[in-house]
Swiss-Prot record:
Domain CTLH: 49-107
Source organism of this protein record: Arabidopsis thaliana (Mouse-ear cress)
Gene this chain is encoded by: WDS
The name this protein goes by in its record: WD repeat-containing protein WDS homolog
Start and end residues of each LisH domain: 16-48
PROSITE patterns: CTLH (PS50897), LISH (PS50896), WD_REPEATS_1 (PS00678), WD_REPEATS_2 (PS50082), WD_REPEATS_REGION (PS50294)
Compartments where located: Cytoplasm
GO CC field: cytoplasm
Amino acid sequence: MENGLWEVLGSKGLLKKHEFIRILVQCLYSLGFKNSASCLEFESKILYKTADSEFLEKQVLSGNWDSCVQVLDRIFDNSMDDTRNTALYLVFKQCLLEYLKRGDVSLALNVLRKQAPLLRMGKEKIHRLACDIVYSKEMESGEVDNCLVLDLRRKLLVELEKLIPLPIVIPERRLEHLVETAVMDQIDTCMYHNSCDAVSLYKDHCCGRDQIPSETVQILVAHKNEVWFVQFSNSGKYLATASSDCTAIIWKVLDDNKVELKHTLESHQNPVSFVSWSPDDTKLLTCGNAEVLKLWDVDTGVLRHTFGNNNTGFTVSSCAWFPDSTRLVCGSSDPERGIVMWDTDGNEIKAWRGTRIPKVVDLAVTPDGESMITVFSDKEIRILNLETKVERVISEEQPITSLSISGDGKFFIVNLSCQEIHLWDLAGEWKQPLKFSGHRQSKYVIRSCFGGLDSSFIASGSEDSQVYIWNLKNTKPLEVLSGHSMTVNCVSWNPKNPRMLASASDDQTIRIWGPGKPNKPLN
């Protein structure tokens, strides 16, 4: 055993053999292979549990609190007084709880008087301990439940083991944690990782381009002019497109990921350049730079409402929903109209107008409904907390054409006419954005989006007729997808299928992209 303490494993000689065997034994026990674990302990003469940890476990589970205190005093040295006091506090709390639950009030008070000095507890801490016990759910009326008591003791043991210093106790499931950490490190360096499936331990992790949408699987032809906007619904079961032919189309995503036309929405008199799905996917908003805002029923394709007064030409450039699917907000390309919040019946709830409100380029509401992000024509991004009314302003140096929020609402991206996409954090901790480049944008409105597993990717259209994909860890393009013959105006990643992407182009088509071929060389 003494010699074994100095033996090492691995090609780098960094792994101590006795520690490696000990966590192997722990793993076998946790997986239920008790006989195998015991056999390994016998053969290696290396025990998973030390004498102190085994003794403590027995005392806790049997409720021998005096013995628990003694072993804890022995385990913690003078440099760990705070940790020792925390451990003793947990033990006394469980002890008092059990006495009070059984009705032994006098015994509980006696323990409190006797043991309080050990913890150097003042009146405040004693009062807190008493309150913790009296108001705990375990003190609810009813007979003493032995199963509950044993369960509470097991939980106490877990908490104590977190406090006990190494190597007396090994952290729970240590081998699983080490392996999982190693796998996660490999995943973090994998630019194509796009699946939550379990990974193989037989080889180092490395994904190919078959994990992301990089091949055209379907071309949708229904619009009669340029397609300016595309967006998957929140459930991923529908797709909406908007065109300069003055129509919008609702498409159905089938179970095999094929897409078919569901409704053509014909009521606009001018080009449609923006759509927005309600969070429950029952309603769709459509609008355009020279158009009014319209609300459609997704199931029937029927126009439910036209917002504003048509006679005054209340044009809307962008719109967004609140999480309840009953309120929406729209921004006008007319500065005098500003930003308006409506209900779905067309009643104005709130408006932001005045000289401080320039032309609205794009806007969005965070998934939690707490903040509204607005992009203005003066190169400003304003983030308004709708509850506190606190507003944060970000000034860009170049004109901004579009905005998109990540699925978790923590980040947003903006496309700039200088051929860059800027990634900002919503919390405002970053002083500078991450800048992604490689695509072409100088004359037209180009839109990008987050997508893939955990919003790990960005996709964007481009004036060179390509679709560009970046991994958030690299500001240079990961993939450049060819297929369209004219400017790609907008892209949308299916929020429920990380391997499905849609793109809309001036060539009057919508392309659906699926997983690429794993053996195809990268562009």
